Amino acid sequence: MPLFATPFAQLDLVRQPEQDGEPLQAFDAADEYLLNQLHERGVTAQCRVLVLNDAFGALAASLAPHVQVTSSGDSHLGFLALRKNLARNGLDLGSVRFVPASETAVGPFDHVLVKVPKTLALLEEQLIRLHGQLAPGAQVVAAGMVKHLPRAAGDLLERYIGPMHASLAVKKARLLIAEAAERPQPRSPYPTRYRLEQPPLTLLNHANVFCREGLDIGTRAFLPHLPRSLGALRAADLGCGNGVLGIAYALLNPQAELTLVDESYMAVQSARENWRAALGERPATFRADDGLAGQAAGSLDLVLCNPPFHQQQVVGDFLAWRMFLQARDALAAGGELWIVGNRHLGYHAKLKRLFRGVEQVAANPKFVILKAGK
C-alpha cells in the first residue's frame, strides 16, 4: 500500500477491520485536500484542531505531532483504526483525544476538519454540537469525494456555522469552507422516535442510527419469528442498532441475559435508552465494540443478527462474514445464530461453511430468516 504523504507526515495506514489482500486504501484524496488546505492556512503547536469522522485516523494521526488534536466520530472501528495507525507509525496513543459522537467535544477549537458522513443527520447533529465550541475566527472545512458530496452538506454548514463557499475539485475531491459567524443556539431535531405496534414500543433513535425514521424491513420480517420461552439463556443482539431485536427478545424471554453490541456509539446509546424505557431496571450489557471481538469464547447461547452489508461507501458481505465468525467463536456448543438477510446475499451457503447445521425459519419474497447451530 502507498504511504499517505502530506506536508504534515508520511504515514503507513491500514483500514479496520483489516482484510487479507485488502485492495482499498485507508485514506482518500479528500483527506489529502483537507490537510493541504490546513497547511496553507498555517498552524502552530498551540492550535486546537477538531477532526470529525476520520474513518481510519489519517487526519488525526497526520496532525498529532504538530497541533492539539481531538478526534470525534460515531464508529468504534474508526477509534480502533486510529489507535492502530498511531501505534503503527510510532506515535503516542495519548497524542489524540477521542470523543464518541454520542458526546460533545469540548473546545474551543481553532480549526475543524470534517469528513462528510454518509448519513447527513450525523453531520447535522455534529454541526449543532459545535455551537459554543468554536474560537473567534475559527474555520470549519468539510470534505468529500465529489460523487459522495451532496449539496445539502453545504446548506447545513451555512445554517449552523456561517458563510460557506465550495472549492474547486482536486483529484475528484472538494472542500466546503465555512467561516464561523454568530448563529442563534440551534435546537437539535435528534433523537427521533417512532412507534412500533408489535411489540408495542416507542423507539428512540439518535442521529446516526440506521433507519431512524422507522423500522427497517429486514427487522420487521425477523420480529415475528424470534425464539421465545427459552429460559435463562445468554443472548446477544449483534449490530443492535436501536436495540429493537434484543428488547423484543427480552420481552419474550423474561429470564434471558442480554448483551447489546454495535460499533456505533449512537446506536448503543439509543439501545440503552430504549431498553430502560421498555424494561426498566432489568440488567443488560451495552457495549460499543468490534462486533463480538471482545466476547469470551463459548460465553453465549444465542446470537441475533441483522447484518449490515456496507461500511461507509463500500458495499459487500465482508462485515457479515466477520460477524458470523465472531458469533461462532462466542457461542457455546449447541448455541445458535439467528439472522435475517436479503435472499440474494446467499447467507445460507456461507453459514454452512461455519456451522454444523443451518435451517430456514421463515422467508418472504425479499428476506430469509436462518438459524445456524454450533
UniProtKB/Swiss-Prot annotation:
Top-level taxonomic group: Bacteria
Catalytic activity line of the entry: guanosine(1835) in 23S rRNA + S-adenosyl-L-methionine = N(2)-methylguanosine(1835) in 23S rRNA + S-adenosyl-L-homocysteine + H(+)
Primary location recorded for the protein, binned into one broad class: cytoplasm
Cited SUPFAM superfamilies: S-adenosyl-L-methionine-dependent methyltransferases (SSF53335)
EC number: 2.1.1.174
Subcellular location: Cytoplasm
Any one GO molecular-function label of the UniProt entry: 23S rRNA (guanine(1835)-N(2))-methyltransferase activity
Alphabetized UniProt keyword annotations: Cytoplasm, Methyltransferase, rRNA processing, S-adenosyl-L-methionine, Transferase
Cellular-component GO terms for this entry: cytoplasm
UniProt xrefs under CDD domains: AdoMet_MTases
Alphabetical list of Pfam families matching this protein: MTS
Family annotation (PANTHER family): RIBOSOMAL RNA LARGE SUBUNIT METHYLTRANSFERASE G, RIBOSOMAL RNA SMALL SUBUNIT METHYLTRANSFERASE C
Role description: Specifically methylates the guanine in position 1835 (m2G1835) of 23S rRNA.
Family that this chain belongs to: Belongs to the methyltransferase superfamily. RlmG family.
Name by which UniProt lists this protein: Ribosomal RNA large subunit methyltransferase G
Gene: rlmG
